[in-house]
């Protein structure tokens, strides 16, 4: 997106974006470029990768770009200059890294795109991610099931939100969701009162919750003064919380105004709490522990001169090449299964969700 709940703005601003590298004597250092600390998800990713790489005997050089493209470019260039052996990059903007990746290639450094595909470069060696199309399918199925569309119920009003247009995953999420929702839209069982469809209309730059909240405010005032929105496709928990804030601000969730079905992604704690409270309807769980393991396995293979295991060699065309990829399976989470998936699975402790 990889897929954003956001931390408070004050906390995000207050966190230093430089993380001192930790070095191992034997195996060399792996550079890890993460996009932001303004999302709990990316903090978890960074911690999981560092923990597993260090356990495998590697030094780690973890940097967060603070959603600042030039900052991330500078960080990656420094990793190349310092001679990091492999780069693991979750790009802020997947289209901006071509020049620095050419330098990495010239220096013999392998590059793994981490959960966000790096585009327009032939120097992306592997991609570790989840089945992003399936993420969208699961989100849409949550809406279909929640509304009872398969039972012939409807019509219902729905509004659509997409992720950041500079994140390749956002298009997979949206396309996956629309593969399920479009037949219901075409038949009139789902009605997009705003008429806003397509990533050019519904995308949310940088996955920004405030932008999503402002757009939901505008949709409600322009199209729903005398109508009820029944569902909102949201691709990410951070957006979902902003959308729900907008809805609650005009009375949804009180009196006779039922909250619409609102989807999400990343199983961030505020959204899981919202699901438990009966507000957000669902989220998608992407186990970053497993993604870190796949990434470390790729690093090990590359450092040993072997070919990393992949599961997909056809889907992820970055505009220059089809990048060999390992796709993990996402899991839909709602009030009925969050304990089994998130608590019993060891991702969260029960008291974290209280």
UniProtKB/Swiss-Prot annotation:
- What's an example of a GO molecular-function annotation for this chain? carbohydrate binding
Q: What is its main location?
A: periplasm
GO BP:
chemotaxis
Enumerate the UniProt keywords alphabetically.
Answer: Chemotaxis, Crown gall tumor, Periplasm, Signal
Q: Which residues form the signal peptide?
A: 1-25
Q: Where in the cell is it found?
A: Periplasm
Q: What's the superkingdom here? A: Bacteria
InterPro entries reported in the protein's UniProt record: Bact_Solute-Bind_Prot2, ChvE-like, Peripla_BP_I, SBP_2_dom
User: What is any one of the record's Gene Ontology cellular component terms?
Assistant: outer membrane-bounded periplasmic space
Query: What does this protein do, in the record's words?
Result: Required for effective transcriptional induction of the vir genes by monosaccharides in response to plant signals and for normal growth and chemotaxis towards certain sugars. Functions as a periplasmic multiple sugar-binding receptor protein. It does not interact with a transport system.
Annotated family: Belongs to the bacterial solute-binding protein 2 family.
Name assigned to this protein:
Multiple sugar-binding periplasmic receptor ChvE
Organism, scientific name = Rhizobium radiobacter
């Amino acid at each position: 997106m990889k897929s954003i709940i956001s931390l408070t703005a004050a906390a995000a601003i207050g966190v230093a974006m430089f993380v001192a590298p930790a070095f191992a004597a034997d195996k060399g250092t792996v550079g890890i470029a993460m996009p932001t600390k303004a999302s709990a998800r990316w903090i978890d990713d960074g911690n999981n990768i560092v923990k597993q790489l260090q356990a495998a005997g590697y030094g780690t050089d973890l940097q967060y770009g603070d959603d600042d493209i030039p900052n991330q470019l500078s960080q990656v260039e420094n990793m190349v200059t310092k001679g990091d052996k492999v780069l693991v990059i979750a790009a802020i903007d997947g289209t901006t890294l071509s020049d620095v990746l050419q330098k990495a290639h010239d220096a013999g450094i392998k590059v793994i795109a981490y959960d966000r595909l790096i585009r327009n470069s032939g120097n992306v060696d592997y991609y570790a991610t989840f089945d992003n199309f399936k993420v969208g399918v699961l989100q849409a199925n949550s809406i279909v099931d929640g509304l009872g569309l398969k039972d012939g119920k409807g019509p219902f009003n729905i509004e659509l939100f997409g992720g950041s247009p500079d994140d390749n995953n956002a298009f997979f999420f949206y396309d996956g969701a629309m593969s399920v929702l479009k037949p219901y839209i075409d038949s009139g069982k789902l009605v997009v009162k705003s008429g806003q469809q397509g990533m050019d209309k519904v995308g949310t730059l940088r996955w920004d919750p405030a932008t999503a909240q402002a757009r939901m405010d505008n949709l409600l005032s322009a199209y729903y003064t005398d109508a009820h929105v029944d569902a909102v496709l949201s691709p990410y928990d951070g957006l979902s919380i902003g959308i729900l804030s907008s809805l609650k601000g005009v009375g949804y969730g009180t009196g006779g105004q039922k909250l619409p079905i609102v989807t999400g992604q990343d199983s961030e704690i505020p959204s899981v709490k919202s699901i438990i409270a009966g507000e957000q309807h669902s989220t998608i769980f992407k186990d970053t522990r497993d993604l870190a393991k796949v990434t470390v396995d790729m690093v090990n293979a590359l450092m040993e001169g072997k070919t990393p295991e992949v599961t997909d060699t056809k889907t992820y065309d970055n505009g220059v090449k089809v990048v060999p990829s390992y796709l993990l399976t996402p899991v839909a989470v709602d009030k009925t299964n969050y304990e089994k998936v998130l608590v019993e699975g060891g991702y969260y402790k029960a008291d974290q969700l209280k």
